[in-house]
Amino acid sequence: QTLDYVQPFQQGFGGSFELATRIAKKTPGNLNQIFYTICGSTAVETALKICIAYHKARGHGQRFRFVGRERAYHGMNIGATSVGGMINNVKTFASILMPGVVHMRHTHLPEHKFVKGQPETGAELADDLDRIAMNFGSENIAACIVEPISGSTGTLVPPKGYLNRLREICDKHDILLIF
């Protein structure tokens, strides 16, 4: 018999190993580990924890800050709501959100309203991360989290060059980038 779903906590199954191998083959670089979660919210929470653990393992335990983006939605859990930029969620749950989260501006500029595909302008918005790193100290920032395409606010595609610029800034400051 076959189960529809089994929580893969501390155990593995043939199908999960097969899927992990297929995913690894389709990703760039030398990805050799896959971590399954039960939903997107849990995936975000896990990614945040992995970032903190990664920096602690490297002797950089002071890296506790996260940078999100305005209008972003990353899930319903506390960490995901904290790094998300949905203003009503932030206002409603402000007293229990994670400290040390800062938000960059969103990438949906007024001139992008009727643009199909990737807008030509706006890549410089990624420089918000550079300014945040200077203001708060890049040595204190664990990761930056963005939706490559923002689905919660109308399927907003980032400007050309934005994600590449964000990657460059993260690399410059040793900040992890979560998609």
Walk through the language-model features, giving the residues of each.
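Glycine- and other small-residue-rich loops at beta-strand/loop junctions that grip anionic moieties
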Residues: P8, G12, Y36, T155, ...
